[in-house]
Amino acid sequence: MQFYLKILAFFILLFSSVSADDKNFENKWSLYTGTFDFSDEGAKSTLYGVQYINLNNHYDSFLGKLYPVTGFFLTVDNAKYIYKGFQTTYDKGSFNITPSFTPGLYDKGNGKDLRHVIEFKTEIQISYNISKKSEIALSYNHISNANLGDNNPGANSYMFNYIKKF
């Protein structure tokens, strides 16, 4: 229960600075599903997730514009990962390539033990613009504790995403 309260507080803080009066308000929501740790036959599990991308708040860097990303996923084995980080998008016409880096908190539930509560997710996503406000995508990520734990088993996952701009 305490984990869910932390998630609720996290999203309340995230959206508390958002103003409905902002005429240029634009963001994306991504709903996704896929296979968590597909490369470990004994630990793979279906996952479901949601991600928020704030397009109004970006940081210019040598990589391009970095947009804040916040998300959460849950596996059918009750493993949970809540994260906040950044992504950049490289527009290639109808296609987009989007790498991201999102540190977060992981709870194994009845799923794979990643050996530390702090984990780092690196991801690459390829999306196709089906309209001006919608995309479908395929993404791959790796989650690792970067040797913070006594062991670093990691997890590789792939997802199918539906992304909607509001």
Question: Which role does the model predict for each range below?
Answer:
Residues 52-54, 74, 88-90, 128, ...:
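Residue-level signature of outer-membrane beta-barrel architecture
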Residues 44-50, 153-166:
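Outer-membrane beta-barrel "beta-signal"
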Residues 28-37, 63-75, 98-107, 139-144:
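Transmembrane beta-strand segments that form the barrel wall of outer-membrane beta-barrel proteins
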Residues 48-52, 84-86, 124, 160:
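Membrane-embedded beta-strands of outer-membrane beta-barrel proteins
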Residues 20-57:
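Outer-membrane beta-barrel initiation region
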Residues 20-26, 56-66, 91-97, 133:
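Short loop/turn motifs that connect adjacent beta-strands in outer-membrane beta-barrel proteins
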Residues 36-46, 72-83, 110-117, 147-155:
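Solvent-exposed loop/turn segments connecting transmembrane beta-strands
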Residues 1-26:
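Cleavable N-terminal export/targeting peptides
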